Amino acid sequence: MSKQQHPSSKTQITRRRDTADMTFEQVLHKGSSANMGGLSSMLGKDREASKTAVDQYFRHWDGKTAKTETTKVREERKADYATLTRQYYNLVTDFYEYGWGQSFHFCTFAPGETFASAITRYEHTLAHRIGIKKGMKVLDIGCGVGGPARQIAKFTGANITGITINEYQVERARRYAEMEGYGAGEQLKFVQGDFMALPFEKETFDAVYSIEATVHAPKLEDVYKQIFNVLKPGGIFGLYEWVMTDAYDENDPHHKEIRFGIEHGGGIANLQTAQTAIAAIKAAGFELLESEDLADNSDRAPWYWPLGGNAWQYASTFGDILSTFTMTPAGRAIAHTVLGVVESIGLVPPGTKKTADSLSTTAAALVAGGKEGLFTPMFLMVARKPVAKE
């Protein structure tokens, strides 16, 4: 997608008369943004639009492996990052809400914490380290359906704008905000846009944060530069970044297989290393205040335990064992079978099972990457935009 195109204008399907004035997402989701999320939202999608979304996403992955991937294939994926990312979230947002909740990210776990409380505390921690305060104007890069934005707005009293490339997510984020009483006020709002071409004036925001979202950028330096431009001088940018760690060896076939597996079902055009991320944020003009892999700690429970199938060992409550079951290997195997049946009889759109299988492949790669210390979803960076010298 060129920077001049609207994110939802690129995809075209044959228009029926009753959908001529609708965007692709409106045709695809058919008002399901008003549902409660998860499985109920998967029902009733437009079949033709669903096939288009599946085709546009999986054309970058079908028939490709870590062994056969070429530089040309990776560059093509990077060039098509906008469609790749948008269609990925058209396909997986309902799955994420069903299996994970409204905050699409991992977290660290303190002793005795439930899954939900750990997710919230992790969001509050980032807000605290950035120094977000009441009345500040803050940008959430890659806001998803708004879970973190709502929590940070409550925690700090800041005015938060969330941006995501996916229109369906914007609609869901607005609905959840309204359900919590935010309405159309200034404290919490959501817009659709491409973070590689942010639609805001220069020096608009007092602070910016991103939680596991800028990994979708084709080049980290470029998205960090966009953030630098909209941040006020002296403002702080803090993020949790998905990266391959210093232990990753590009020449090791096993390492490359894990990286490719994470990219495949993660909607990621080009997963980078921690050192690349550090260099990128500095090249964008920021003063790096701190960087830390939060996965490299002595937490009782590793960040990947909800995916690993051993919840009985780490979960703090029986409720967490039940709520995370769908994400475990056993839960994913059941989903493979059930979705195959319901898709064959037309209850869910074409490609639903394929999408679930892709997410399962990536879950296995995430666990392997975490256990072997090759990957982290929580590389914390906190950086300041310098104040111009007089």
UniProtKB/Swiss-Prot annotation:
It catalyses: zymosterol + S-adenosyl-L-methionine = fecosterol + S-adenosyl-L-homocysteine + H(+). Keywords: Lipid biosynthesis, Lipid metabolism, Methyltransferase, S-adenosyl-L-methionine, Steroid biosynthesis, Steroid metabolism, Sterol biosynthesis, Sterol metabolism, Transferase. InterPro entries: Erg6_SMT_methyltransf, Methyltransf_11, MeTrfase_SMT, SAM-dependent_MTases_sf, Sterol_MeTrfase_C. GO terms for cellular component: endoplasmic reticulum. Belongs to the class I-like SAM-binding methyltransferase superfamily. Erg6/SMT family. PANTHER family: HYPOTHETICAL LOC100005854 (PTHR44068:SF1), ZGC:194242 (PTHR44068). GO terms for molecular function: sterol 24-C-methyltransferase activity. This is Sterol 24-C-methyltransferase. It comes from Pyricularia oryzae (strain 70-15 / ATCC MYA-4617 / FGSC 8958) (Rice blast fungus). Residues 1-21 are annotated as: Disordered. PROSITE patterns: SAM_MT_ERG6_SMT. The gene is ERG6. Residues 1-12 have a biased composition (Polar residues). Pathway: Steroid metabolism; ergosterol biosynthesis; ergosterol from zymosterol: step 1/5.
